[in-house]
Amino acid sequence: AIPDDIIKKREKKQSRDKKEADIASSAGEADADSADEPKKAKTASKASKAAKSKKIKKQLEGIELAAQMVKNILKSGLATMGAGGVKTYEQLSKQLGDYYLSGMQHLVNELIIEMKAFDVDGKDEHYDAAAVKLERLWTLIKKSREYLTAKLESDDTQLDDTQLYEQLGGVWKLEELRALGLCRSNAELLQLSFDVSYDDAGKQYIDEGCYIDLGSGELVCTYNYRPVKALKYIRQDDSVFHVTQVGELAMYPGQGNKRVRWNGSTTRAVTKEDIDKVRSFAADYLSDEVKKAKNILKNALAPEIYYTLIRYERIGECGERLALLDKTGASIMLGLSLIHI
């Protein structure tokens, strides 16, 4: 018979060997999982890239539909959009939404609204406005077609620092703006103006605030979009009479007065030093600011308004209107686009 002490030693050894085997097995499984992680990430990345490429191809298809529409209008004339012809364009507008082109869809809606109004009252202002919308639409078609085609050919589906993404209908996420280096820390903003308007083409209210960055003197804007269907879910912005202190300020791609946003802020009272600082950022010469505005606004895709600060010598009446004069005597009609240099 085998002695009891030998049997106990064997049992202990078998138990120890089993534990070591279990540990080795667990380690092997962990290593296998770790090795699979890059594969899983790579697979997810490929799937995401494929989805983005598919979306770009879909957008390009929609762009060609819009391009054909513009060509038809240019061939037959804007007036053909009125009366019975408008239904065709309304149908096209709905289609553009299916091609991830909500920005282009919005422009088509603006065009339709102006031509409907022209068909009713025959006022030239509607026809002229429609012509501007048509030019803006055609510019967006050409630039976005070129941009998206280049993305496909280079196999690059990453987001870029370009305003085209938003103008086509994309919605920027804060982390995306941060990844592009479009965020800066510790900004102080003072609101200079606030306005609420109704966007008939988008069936939404837009709260717009114009702010000055007290650190740089740059004029920036906030936009809060409130669709009519979701008014009870989206809080309306309001006038701000204090200095807004922002830990991280995100700036959207674009020209002129860039759009900004932030998550979380604190406030402090406005001081005399703040007002003096705002005044120090004002331009001395109207002619210089007019040149800047013209260079920005000549781009058909630029915002329709450009904000700037001008130090004036005098503001007085000119007929039934007001005019601003700088220290050189150069003037501009306030509230109008009539410039006298």
Regions found by a protein language model. Name each.
Residues 339-341:
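Conserved small/polar residues in nucleotide/adenosyl-binding loops
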Residues 12-168:
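Extended alpha-helical scaffolds
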Residues 1:
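Active-site-proximal cofactor/substrate-binding loop regions of enzyme domains
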Residues 161-334:
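Extended, amphipathic alpha-helical scaffolds
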